Structure formats: structure tokens, C-alpha cells
């Protein structure tokens, strides 16, 4: 036993090593694993991994087969961190079991065992194999005899030459246990050379044996014989938990035996079991305890059967059920550490301390894997490992034991400075200093020791319990803690207050959606205490942020009233006001019932359907605390715009009725229905839609609309209509009956149009008179029968082009660029339809008729004016009528010559003289050229400068008098007139507003005044035109 002062010195030394960092023993992060190194690998080294964490950082060493590896002596070994690197591995020196040791100042741990093996495959000996001679029908076994090797192998056989491998089937089998080739019944095609191919599953190296010749004997064919099992599994085969077990079975025989499997106990195979290689292999993946037992292979042919039996035994490596964990425990206390593992056979246990076997003594005992150490000392600290093992493996569990010794210390677990309780309550004052071993405690109130009595008692953990607290118990309490390493004190101040009471509690209320309400919660409390109001809604804390638009706390310091605005159905439920102080808490609850419009009805069904009715039933939904008064039904079809309220029987559905018949439905239409409930609050949410149903078929009732027609080609009667919408077709097989007859005839001609979307029908017959009237009607039908016809309407047959030309065609020259063509209309009976107008064709004498220009006039016009023509040139023209079918023949051609062009010389030397009411104009006479029209007169165009309306004065003289109020500026032009049109305009004259009694001007110099050599007032009778 170490003296207390020595233990304290040791603890202080360890604390200095750690500084402020927390000391920690080694803990493995990576441990080495079993490895197989391929002999001859290009990689010239192998690494066994080992890494541990700890503070201080661990250092490492390794053992091979239980002996330390001396890194300074063995140049082939190298440490890289904690990893062991083996350079140029050698199977003679390096094969074995490796373990890693990680050590720091707190102890040592040992890794799991890792086996290093070397995989190799040597060559077959070059030795000729003897010829195998058998009879036809006899079975044979060709031996492989693999060369020396290490590591798992796979086998195959070559027949004669590579790459012709033997294909396994019910007659031929290659054992992956022995490598031998088995042929149950030899056939002539089997004669040849057989070579065993052995492949390493680790290195992929492949070697070939010497060929074995197989020949047939000449002394006859082997007769039939019963099966002889040549490939069978061991009588007892251990199988590991979770492994894949493969049992081989193959027999020789004639005829070829059939292989079957079964369990000896008669239990069926589990679904995971697979039969492979034509039942020659039974495979059990993920082997478990229930897969253990006896298995039988039955080989059978017509000559008999043979059975091979074997037992699979289950084993499991140790697996931890309970690991050990780090423990920190006080000196002189006792340690009980239990580790438990499962496995078969049952594991045994041993313990290590700091990497070495734990030495048992009087204080240290191991029983059933559990470690007990009594009267702990600091020197018991270290790294411990529990090892569970059976013959199939072992597992390690590591943990650190820290044995601590310290004087009482309140710094890590200080006492509460203030404890508040209410009168009459029970209070416990804690006193739990950190101390190893645990400290003994005593108490003082002020300077007086606290003695135990019926209300005051000392707790086992050192705390003080006071029952039925009074005001006199208030004060300062000191806990004095002591062990063999020292003592310490802690203080708590106890405050005793009056209890909190709710003076105005919330009460049950009944409200409607949209209203607002206040739930009161007012209290009386000790003035020394702060108070907190908390509201709970249906057991959850009321969320004033998320539901801030509805919830708000109102009231003063002693009030926590809850206002709920614009109440919704979701606010219905239980409300609890929780009042908390630092000492106590009280609460009061109230139920709030919110009445709202009904919830959606449920389970809407269509119980019966006809062509125009549907009988519905439903179940009542939530009434939301207000009884349902009535129901309404809505329907929707693929053709409707949203949901529509429908007519029902009864017309008004009261709240106690849960069935109704919908009427006035369209036949053969797919409907959905939903139900809406209403109460005093209003209409609720609609139910979910019913399943889609289709009404029954019926005879159609609605004929097509907009029956009309006309147009088309020669000898056609075109009849058109608007198709009947699908929702009004009332059934399948819908179509149209088109009936027509010439006006005045009694017998109808009928035809059927089978497409419901067709909008027209064309009747063709050479006897149809163009543009003749027909009476037309269109009916409907479907598979149920014929429906009504539309009202009779008149439709005209197709037109033909007119057959006669217009008469009395004449042409008149209007100017140098215009002529007017006129004619008489053609008779209506000869128009062969509705006359649309006339087409005028014209060309000049120098052109060709084929390149003539054309102009159309609509309706019954009997003249046309042709513009943009060339002057003084002969033009030819003809006219024909046209309708929608085309144009008729042209009239006889007439000709006319356009007039000469107007003079190109404008009126010159225009002068003016103005008074306050008159303007006198003079200009020089315009003389026409030989190729121009003779001047017949003049036109004077005048307007105010602020307007666009032009007025015209016609005169046959070279002067004119304008009576004008000269109140603003005037713009004046002069043109010569001829039969060929108006000549070129003079320059514009601007006559300014008169400010003096007399003003003069001319086109040559408008700003100068030109005296006239002679002046004669001329009184003119004027004709004024407004030019556009």
C-alpha cells in the first residue's frame, strides 16, 4: 500500500506531463490484417498497418511468432510510423504471426494477430503419364496431382489441344477439391489426350501437367452397372458462420447416374441453397447454425443407387457481446470489469495489462471473463485488454483504467450559490466535490452546525435534505468535505418564498371562425421572484412567431393573457397557461371550441346510374361543432369548365340525408361527383371526387346547328353544319343523316355520314342545275336509334361561270391618261350563279392581247375608269362577267385613243394687285405644242397659308379677280386646262396680309412692286371648288 503523500506526488508528476492536455492511453485506429504475398511479385515489399492515437503520442514495436523484431539488427524490417514494412519478403524467414505493440506513458496495448503467408505454385514434374485404357461405357478417373503450392487453386482440363477445355456436364466432372477429372461413362468421342491445368487464385499463375492419353480397350463394351460414388464430401466438415460451403458429389455408372441431394433429418432446403454443375455441387451461402446437420448425396440410375453422407458442423469465431470501456475510479475503491463474447465453441478469456499477461494476486481475480481488483491503488492504472478466444480465432477489447487520488475540490462541481424554494416544499442542497476517495461531509448554517432531526437529514452522497421548508430555514449553508488527502468547503444561500397562485384562470369557451378572444391568466406571486408566462396548445409550446398573426400575449407584469385573433378551426383544442418562477410553477387549462363551416363529406359513391340520373351516397364529415343544415352536389365532365352545381331529387338535401339522385345528366358522358356540406357558419370544403362513372346510352336529342352550304365545284351541292359536341352525342356509333331535295320536290334524298366530327357533305351529280335552290336538313343517330333533324334551310348548288358576255360595250377617252369603259349587265338567268362583278381587259395598240392588263369591278357596276395610261395612244378593251365558279366570255373588243398631254409650259409672268377685299391676277397665255392638247381655259387654285382646303376658280381668260378678305396670307397657283387634263402649275404666289391700302407682286419677284401698264377692273362670275 502506497502512502497518501506518495500517491499525491505521483499524481502531481503525471499532471505536469500532461500540462493542460487530457492524458489518454493508446487506442488503435488501424490494426494489421492477414496478408498473402505472391512469391515472385514485382512489388518487393509488404506493409502491415498499425496506427494508434493517445496523449502522449504512442511509439511502436512488433513481434513475429511471439518474439520481438529488432529493427536495428534486421535491415529487412522498417518502421514507417507504426506500420511495419517488410523488404524483399522471404517465405522461409517471414512466414508467421505478427502483432503490433503501441505504448505511451499511460500503458501499452497489443494488436490482433495478423498472419503473413506466401502464395506460390511450382511447375509439374516433366514426367510422362501412363496411358489409361478403358472399355466403352466404363467410368474413369484421371488424376491431376497438383505440384507443390500455397494458396487456393482452381482446376480445369484441356482435351487434346489448347484452348479446347473439357466442358462439364452430367457425364463429366472436375473436382475443385482434388483436381481430378471424372467421366461417369466413357464414349468413343472421349478418346484423346487430357492435360490438367492448375491456376493459383492469388497470383493467377497457371501450370500444365503432362498429357494423360485415354484409349478404348478392344475387348468389348462395358455392360450396365449401378452408380459408384467417386467424389464425396468428408463425414464431418466444420463450417464457419457466414462462410460459403460447397459440397461435391459425383458418381461413375452406366447408364449415367442422376445426382440428388437431401437433408438426413428430412427438413427442406432453405431458398438460399443453390445446386451447381448439373447438381454435382451443393452450395450454401452465408452458413448459419440452422444449416448445420447431415446431408445426403444420392446417385441413381436404372441399375441401382448409392448414397454418400456427411455432417456439417457449425463453428463461429469469438464475437464481442460486451466490450470493456475506459474507467476512472477512486483510489481504495474496487473495480469490476466484465467482457463477454459469443462463439462456438464457447470462448475462454484472458487479460493483459500493458501488453503482458495480467498477474493474479489476492486483490486481482478473474472469473468467467470478469476482472475484479479490490482496494485500488494508483499503480493499478494502465492499459488493460480482455482476450476472448476459441480454436477458430480470438478478439481483443481494450480500455484504460485510471485510479485517481485527490483532496476534495469544489472547482469542477461547485455548489449552487442560490437556492430558492417555496414555503412547505422539500429541498435538497447538493454537496458533491470532486474527491478520491469520496469525501465525508458535514453542514453548518451560518456558524452553527446542522443537526439531523425529523425535517433535516444528511444524504448518502453528502447532500442536505430539508422537508416542509419554513421561513426560518432561510440562510447560508456551508458543506465541509474531507478525506485523507485534505478538506474543502462550499456555500449555498437558501431563499424561502411564498407560493405562486393563479387568481384569474382561463375558462372553457365556444367561438366561431373569424372571431377573436382573450384567454385570461393572472397570478399572485412573491415579489422577490421573476415570473414567466408560457402557453401550451394541444400539448405543444405555442409558437408566437409562426402563428404571430393569430397569437399575442397581452396584459401587465402579473398577467399573461393570450389573445387569439381571427380564430380558425385549427385553433380548436386545449390551452394551458404555465406560470413559472425560479421556485415553483402552476398551470391552468381551458378547452376552446371553434365552430366553423363543415369539413368535406367522406366516401362519396355512385350507387346507381342511368342515362340521365345518378344515385349518390356519402358519409358525414366533421361538422366542426356546428350541425350540417344542407348538402349540395357538384359534377364535372371532360367537357365542363370546372365543377358545376347540378339538379337533384330531393331538390333541397337536408343535413340528415346522406343520399340523393342527380337528374338532367347527359347520356353517355363520364361524370365525377362531389358533395359540399353547409351549416350556419357557411359552406364547407367539397369532398374528394367520386370514382368516374359513365351514364348509359340514349337516342340523341340534339341535331346539328348552323346547317348551311353552297359553293363547291361544278355539279356539286355542298351542305355544311356545326358538328354536335361529344357530350350531346348520347352514345357510341354517332353519325349524321343528311337529307336534301330540289325546291318544290316532295321526295327527300338521304345519305349517312358516319364520322361524328365531319362538318360537311358534298353531293355530286351531272344533272344538278347550277345555282339551283335545294331544301336541306341534317339529323343525328347512334347505336340506340335516330334523333331529330335540324330545321329545313335552303342551300344553292354550285355555280358555273357565266355563259354570255356583257353587251353595248363602249369606251370614252377622258384625258391623256384616263379612259372610261361602260357596258350593259348580263341577264340574271344567264349568270349561272351569284354575279360577283366584271373584269375589264385592256392593252394599247403597240402591245399584245396576251400581255393585257386587267381590272375588276365588284357587284353590278356597269362602268370602269382606267387610269395611268399613255397619252395620244390607241387602246383596246373587252369586258366579261365572273362569279365564284369563274369568268365568262369576253365581249367584242372596242378601241379608243387617249387625248394629247396637257401643255408642259406653266402660266408665266403671273402678277397681282391686291386691295383690302380684292386680288387682281394677270398671266401670260400658254401656247400648246403640236403634240399637246389645245388650251381651253385656266384654273386658279388658292388657299390660306394656315389651311389645306384649296379652292378653284375656272376662267377662259388670262386674268382673274378674287374677292377675298385679306386678313392673312394666301397661297395661289395657276394651271392651264385642256381636253387632255390640267397643265403644269405656275410657281406658288404668296400674297401677304394687307396692311396698307394697296399692294402688288409677281412670280418673278414677289417682294417687289410692279406697276401695271394698263388696268381694267373685271367683274367675274366665279365657281369655287374645294380640292381635297
From Swiss-Prot:
Region annotation Disordered: where it falls in the sequence: 684-713
Record-stated family: Belongs to the immunoglobulin superfamily. Contactin family.
Signal peptide range: 1-19
UniProt keywords, alphabetically: Cell adhesion, Cell membrane, Disulfide bond, Glycoprotein, GPI-anchor, Immunoglobulin domain, Lipoprotein, Membrane, Repeat, Signal
Cell location: Cell membrane
Pfam families in the record: fn3, I-set, Ig_3
Membrane topology: Lipid-anchor; GPI-anchor
GPI-anchor amidated serine: lipidated positions: 1002
Cysteines joined through disulfide linkages: 50-100, 144-196, 249-297, 339-386, 431-479, 521-577
Domain Ig-like C2-type: 26-117, 122-208, 227-313, 318-402, 408-497, 499-593
CDD domains with a match to the protein in the record: FN3
Expression sites (tissue/organ): In brain, it is expressed in frontal lobe, occipital lobe, cerebellum and amygdala.
GO annotation, cellular component aspect: extracellular region; neuron projection; plasma membrane; side of membrane
Origin species: Homo sapiens (Human)
Assembly notes: Interacts with PTPRG.
Domain Fibronectin type-III: 600-698, 703-800, 805-901, 902-998
GO BP terms, alphabetized: cell adhesion
Biological function: Contactins mediate cell surface interactions during nervous system development. Has some neurite outgrowth-promoting activity.
Major subcellular site: membrane
Designated name of the protein: Contactin-3
Source taxonomy: Eukaryota, Metazoa, Chordata, Craniata, Vertebrata
Matches recorded under InterPro entries: FN3_dom, FN3_sf, Ig-like_dom, Ig-like_dom_sf, Ig-like_fold, Ig_I-set, Ig_sub, Ig_sub2
Residue span(s) of the pro-peptide: 1003-1028
Amino acid at each position: 500500500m502506497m502512502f497518501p503523500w506518495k500517491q499525491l506526488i505521483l499524481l502531481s508528476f503525471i499532471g505536469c506531463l500532461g500540462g493542460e492536455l487530457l492524458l489518454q492511453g493508446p487506442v488503435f485506429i488501424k490494426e494489421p490484417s492477414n496478408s498473402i504475398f505472391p512469391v515472385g511479385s514485382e512489388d518487393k515489399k509488404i506493409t502491415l498497418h498499425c496506427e494508434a492515437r493517445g496523449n502522449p503520442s504512442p511509439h511502436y514495436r512488433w513481434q513475429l511468432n511471439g518474439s520481438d523484431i529488432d529493427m536495428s539488427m534486421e535491415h529487412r524490417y522498417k518502421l514507417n510510423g507504426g506500420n511495419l514494412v517488410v523488404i524483399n519478403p522471404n517465405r522461409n524467414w517471414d512466414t508467421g504471426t505478427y502483432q503490433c505493440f503501441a505504448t505511451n506513458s499511460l500503458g501499452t496495448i497489443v494488436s490482433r494477430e495478423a498472419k503473413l503467408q506466401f502464395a506460390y505454385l511450382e511447375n509439374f514434374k516433366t514426367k510422362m503419364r501412363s496411358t489409361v485404357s478403358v472399355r466403352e461405357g466404363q467410368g474413369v478417373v484421371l488424376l491431376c496431382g497438383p505440384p507443390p503450392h500455397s494458396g487456393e487453386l482452381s482446376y480445369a482440363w484441356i482435351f487434346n489441344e489448347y484452348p479446347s477445355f473439357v466442358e462439364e456436364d452430367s457425364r463429366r466432372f472436375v473436382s475443385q477439391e482434388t483436381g481430378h477429372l471424372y467421366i461417369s461413362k466413357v464414349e468413343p468421342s472421349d478418346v484423346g489426350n487430357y492435360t490438367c491445368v492448375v491456376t493459383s487464385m492469388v497470383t493467377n499463375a497457371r501450370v500444365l501437367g503432362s498429357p494423360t492419353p485415354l484409349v478404348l480397350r478392344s475387348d468389348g463394351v462395358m455392360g450396365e452397372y449401378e452408380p459408384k460414388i467417386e467424389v464425396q464430401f468428408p463425414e464431418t466438415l466444420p463450417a464457419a458462420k457466414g462462410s460459403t460451403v460447397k459440397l461435391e458429389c459425383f458418381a461413375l455408372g452406366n447408364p449415367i447416374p442422376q445426382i440428388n441431394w437431401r437433408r438426413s433429418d428430412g427438413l427442406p432446403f432453405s431458398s438460399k441453397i443453390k445446386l451447381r454443375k448439373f447438381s454435382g455441387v451443393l452450395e450454401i451461402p452465408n452458413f448459419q447454425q440452422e444449416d448445420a446437420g447431415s446431408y445426403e448425396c444420392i446417385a441413381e440410375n436404372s441399375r441401382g443407387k448409392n448414397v454418400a453422407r456427411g455432417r456439417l458442423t457449425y463453428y463461429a469465431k469469438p464475437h464481442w457481446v460486451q466490450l470493456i470501456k475506459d474507467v476512472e475510479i477512486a483510489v481504495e475503491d474496487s473495480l469490476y470489469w466484465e467482457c463477454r463474447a459469443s462463439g462456438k465453441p464457447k470462448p475462454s478469456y484472458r487479460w493483459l495489462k500493458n501488453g503482458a499477461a495480467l498477474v493474479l494476486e489476492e486483490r486481482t481475480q478473474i472469473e468467467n471473463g470478469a476482472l475484479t481488483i479490490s482496494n485500488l491503488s494508483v499503480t493499478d492504472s494502465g492499459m488493460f485488454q480482455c482476450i476472448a478466444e476459441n480454436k477458430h480465432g480470438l478478439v481483443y477489447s481494450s480500455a484504460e483504467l485510471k485510479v485517481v487520488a485527490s483532496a476534495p475540490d469544489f472547482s469542477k462541481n461547485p455548489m449552487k450559490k442560490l437556492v430558492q424554494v417555496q414555503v412547505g416544499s422539500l429541498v435538497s442542497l447538493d454537496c458533491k466535490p470532486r474527491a478520491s476517495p469520496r469525501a465525508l461531509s458535514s453542514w453548518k448554517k451560518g456558524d452553527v452546525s446542522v443537526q439531523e432531526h425529523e425535517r433535516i437529514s444528511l444524504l448518502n452522497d453528502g447532500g442536505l435534505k430539508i422537508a416542509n421548508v419554513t421561513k426560518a430555514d432561510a440562510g447560508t449553508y456551508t458543506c465541509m468535505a474531507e478525506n485523507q488527502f485534505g478538506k474543502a468547503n462550499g456555500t449555498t444561500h437558501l431563499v424561502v418564498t411564498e407560493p405562486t397562485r393563479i387568481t384569474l384562470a382561463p375558462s372553457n369557451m365556444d367561438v366561431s371562425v373569424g372571431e377573436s378572444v382573450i384567454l385570461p391568466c393572472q397570478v399572485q406571486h412573491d415579489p422577490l421572484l421573476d415570473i414567466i408566462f408560457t402557453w401550451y396548445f394541444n400539448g405543444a409550446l405555442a409558437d408566437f412567431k409562426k402563428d404571430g398573426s393569430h397569437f399575442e400575449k397581452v396584459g401587465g407584469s402579473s398577467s399573461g393573457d393570450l389573445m387569439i385573433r381571427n380564430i380558425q378551426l385549427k385553433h380548436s383544442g386545449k390551452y394551458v397557461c404555465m406560470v413559472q418562477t425560479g421556485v415553483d410553477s402552476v398551470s391552468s387549462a381551458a378547452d376552446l371550441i371553434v365552430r366553423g363551416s363543415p369539413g368535406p363529406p367522406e366516401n362519396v359513391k355512385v350507387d346507381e346510374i342511368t342515362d340521365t340520373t345518378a344515385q349518390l351516397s356519402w358519409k358525414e364529415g366533421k361538422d366542426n361543432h356546428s350541425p350540417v343544415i344542407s348538402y349540395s352536389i357538384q359534377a364535372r365532365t371532360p367537357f365542363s369548365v370546372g365543377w358545376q352545381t347540378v339538379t337533384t331529387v330531393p331538390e333541397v338535401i337536408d343535413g340528415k340525408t346522406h343520399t340523393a339522385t342527380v337528374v338532367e345528366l347527359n347520356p353517355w358522358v363520364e361524370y365525377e361527383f362531389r358533395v359540399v356540406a353547409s351549416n350556419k357558419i357557411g359552406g364547407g370544403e367539397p369532398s374528394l371526387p367520386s370514382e368516374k362513372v359513365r351514364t348509359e346510352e340514349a337516342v340523341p336529342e340534339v341535331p346539328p346547328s348552323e346547317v348551311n352550304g353552297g359553293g363547291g365545284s361544278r355539279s356539286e351541292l355542298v351542305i355544311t353544319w356545326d358538328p354536335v359536341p361529344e357530350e350531346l352525342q348520347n352514345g357510341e356509333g354517332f353519325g349524321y343523316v343528311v337529307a336534301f331535295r330540289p325546291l318544290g320536290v316532295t321526295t327527300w334524298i338521304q345519305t349517312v355520314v358516319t364520322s361524328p366530327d365531319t362538318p360537311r357533305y358534298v353531293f355530286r351529280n351531272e344533272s344538278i342545275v347550277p345555282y339551283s335552290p335545294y331544301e336541306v336538313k341534317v339529323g343525328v343517330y347512334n347505336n340506340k336509334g335516330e334523333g331529330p333533324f335540324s330545321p329545313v334551310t335552303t342551300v344553292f348548288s354550285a355555280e358555273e361561270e357565266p355563259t354570255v358576255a356583257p353587251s353595248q360595250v363602249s369606251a370614252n377617252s377622258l384625258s391623256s391618261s384616263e379612259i372610261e369603259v361602260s357596258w350593259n349587265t348580263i341577264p340574271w338567268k344567264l349568270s349561272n350563279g351569284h354575279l360577283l362583278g366584271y373584269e375589264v381587259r385592256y392593252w394599247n395598240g403597240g402591245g399584245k392581247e396576251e400581255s393585257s392588263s386587267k381590272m375588276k369591278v365588284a357587284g353590278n357596276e356597269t362602268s370602269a375608269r382606267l387610269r395611268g395610261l399613255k397619252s395620244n395612244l390607241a387602246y383596246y378593251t373587252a369586258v366579261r362577267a365572273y362569279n365564284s365558279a369563274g369568268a365568262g366570255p369576253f365581249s367584242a373588243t372596242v378601241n379608243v385613243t387617249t387625248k394629247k398631254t396637257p401643255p408642259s409650259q406653266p402660266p408665266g409672268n403671273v402678277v397681282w394687285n391686291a386691295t383690302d377685299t380684292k386680288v387682281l391676277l394677270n398671266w401670260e397665255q400658254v401656247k400648246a405644242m403640236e403634240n399637246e392638247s389645245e388650251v381651253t381655259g385656266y384654273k386658279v387654285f388658292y388657299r390660306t397659308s394656315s389651311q389645306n382646303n384649296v379652292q378653284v376658280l375656272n376662267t377662259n381668260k388670262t386674268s382673274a379677280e378674287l374677292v377675298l378678305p385679306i386678313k392673312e396670307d394666301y397661297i395661289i397657283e395657276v394651271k392651264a386646262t385642256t381636253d387632255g387634263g390640267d397643265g403644269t402649275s405656275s410657281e406658288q404666289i404668296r400674297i401677304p396680309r394687307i396692311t396698307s391700302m394697296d399692294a402688288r407682286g409677281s412670280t418673278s419677284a414677289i417682294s417687289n412692286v410692279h406697276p401695271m401698264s394698263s388696268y381694267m377692273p373685271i367683274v367675274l362670275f366665279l365657281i369655287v371648288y374645294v380640292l381635297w
